[in-house]
């Protein structure tokens, strides 16, 4: 008799993806983030669903409905803060996941990588629209500033902005459509994740050495299922500690003030996970130039497979490239810090230098260093 797990049309898909999947024997904890992102997505959809049951997408009641969730709904505060801090965890894992891909050369799986970059854009769009929903000061002004950037697009810009707003300013129509998109996007993201995994399973996972591991594979279950469960346990401990002890640590106090179109906050800034891109945007004293730099700061990820000039795939055995990689990480941390600072001296100059260094490192330094390493190894 055949095993149902291997013969049933639906169950065998799960079997080939999570049970009998041949996986490299040497993948480290850096390979845990994919599963953690999956758990994050599930958690966000679940908590978001319960929040949507009590939320009202109307400018007059949105802020009050969020307050009502926190005060009157059973464990509403828990659901709300798990959703808000879950988004932060999501982005931490996303950045680790991308960093892992860059360090170990996983971007040479071009289909998987490009779908991943599109996923990043989709998640960023979802998070941005979610931040608008509580209709606090930073929600309103964040939405105004970011949507206004589209007016920099030549010819169609101003019309496009009014079309997105559904009027002549960020108002009821904007909030309603942002709620609709914020609700639907995670399901589109889920579908994209499935495509991401489909492409990944065509090639199999990369590993820290960057070499072909076909000769040394182990079954995903039980080895990596137990490893993933440990990662999930650590994630839940971190998330619940954040939610229970310092739920507002990563938020903005301005968002506890209801949105007021007549009063601009002194410092308009997005959530922490967008600050690096926001710093790049602000470092260019031209609207269109800033918007292009902002888009290319993420889109540049798609160039990694093209810019790869080393004879080795991974950075594991390339100390010079490793130095540059960590320089890039430090650079992004500096950009994140600058994004949260007011637009004044010396922050403007630091931001401009960090923005130039970001693009220079990726486009010039990393490929040329890889070529130099090839030469040093007489390859």
Curated annotation (Swiss-Prot):
Residues reported in the UniProt entry to bind heme b b566: 97, 196
Sequence positions that bind heme b b562: 83, 182
GO MF, any single term: metal ion binding
InterPro entries: Cyt_b/b6_C, Cyt_b/b6_C_sf, Cyt_b/b6_N, Cytb/b6-like_sf, Cytochrome_b, Cytochrome_b_C_euk/bac, Cytochrome_b_N_euk/bac, Di-haem_cyt_TM
Gene Ontology BP terms: mitochondrial electron transport, ubiquinol to cytochrome c
Transmembrane annotation, as ranges: 33-53, 77-98, 113-133, 178-198, 226-246, 288-308, 320-340, 347-367
Keywords associated with the record: Electron transport, Heme, Iron, Membrane, Metal-binding, Mitochondrion, Mitochondrion inner membrane, Respiratory chain, Transmembrane, Transmembrane helix, Transport, Ubiquinone
Pfam annotation, one family: Cytochrom_B_C
Location within or outside the cell: Mitochondrion inner membrane
GO (cellular component) term, any one: mitochondrial inner membrane
Record's function text: Component of the ubiquinol-cytochrome c reductase complex (complex III or cytochrome b-c1 complex) that is part of the mitochondrial respiratory chain. The b-c1 complex mediates electron transfer from ubiquinol to cytochrome c. Contributes to the generation of a proton gradient across the mitochondrial membrane that is then used for ATP synthesis.
Further remark: Heme 1 (or BL or b562) is low-potential and absorbs at about 562 nm, and heme 2 (or BH or b566) is high-potential and absorbs at about 566 nm.
Subunit structure as annotated in this protein's UniProt entry: The cytochrome bc1 complex contains 11 subunits: 3 respiratory subunits (MT-CYB, CYC1 and UQCRFS1), 2 core proteins (UQCRC1 and UQCRC2) and 6 low-molecular weight proteins (UQCRH/QCR6, UQCRB/QCR7, UQCRQ/QCR8, UQCR10/QCR9, UQCR11/QCR10 and a cleavage product of UQCRFS1). This cytochrome bc1 complex then forms a dimer.
Protein's recorded name: Cytochrome b
């Amino acid at each position: 008799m055949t095993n149902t797990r291997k013969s049933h049309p639906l169950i065998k898909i799960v079997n080939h993806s999570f049970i009998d999947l041949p996986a490299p024997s040497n993948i480290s904890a850096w390979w845990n983030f994919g599963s953690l992102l999956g758990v994050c997505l599930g958690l966000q959809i679940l908590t978001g669903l319960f929040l949507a049951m009590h939320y009202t997408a109307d400018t007059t009641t949105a802020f009050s409905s969020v307050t009502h969730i926190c005060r009157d709904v059973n464990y509403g505060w828990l659901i709300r803060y798990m959703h808000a801090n879950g988004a932060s965890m999501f982005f931490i894992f996303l950045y680790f996941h991308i960093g892992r891909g860059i360090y170990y050369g996983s971007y040479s799986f071009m289909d998987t990588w490009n779908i991943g970059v599109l996923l990043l854009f989709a998640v960023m769009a979802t998070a941005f629209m979610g931040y608008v929903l509580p209709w606090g000061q930073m929600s309103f002004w964040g939405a105004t500033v970011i949507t206004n950037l589209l007016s920099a697009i030549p010819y169609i810009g101003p019309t496009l902005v009014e079309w997105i707003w559904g009027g002549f300013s960020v108002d009821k129509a904007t909030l309603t459509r942002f709620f609709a998109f914020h609700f639907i996007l995670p399901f589109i993201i889920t579908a994209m994740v499935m495509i991401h995994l489909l492409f990944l399973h065509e090639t199999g996972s990369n590993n820290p050495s960057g070499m072909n591991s076909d000769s040394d594979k182990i079954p995903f279950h039980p080895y990596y299922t137990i490893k993933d469960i440990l990662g999930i346990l650590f994630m839940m401990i971190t998330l619940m500690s954040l939610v229970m002890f310092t739920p507002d640590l990563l938020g903005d106090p301005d968002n506890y003030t209801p949105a007021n179109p007549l009063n601009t906050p002194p410092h308009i800034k997005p959530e922490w996970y967008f600050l690096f891109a926001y710093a790049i945007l602000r470092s260019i004293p031209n609207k269109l130039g800033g918007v292009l730099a902002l888009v290319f700061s993420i889109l540049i990820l798609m160039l990694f497979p093209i810019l790869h000039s080393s004879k080795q795939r991974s950075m594991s055995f390339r100390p010079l490239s490793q130095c540059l990689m960590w320089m890039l990480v430090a650079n992004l941390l500096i950009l994140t810090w600058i994004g949260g600072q007011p637009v004044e001296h010396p922050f403007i100059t630091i931001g401009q230098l960090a923005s130039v260094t970001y693009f220079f490192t990726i486009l010039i330094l990393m490929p040329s260093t890889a070529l130099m390493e090839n030469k040093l190894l007489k390859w």
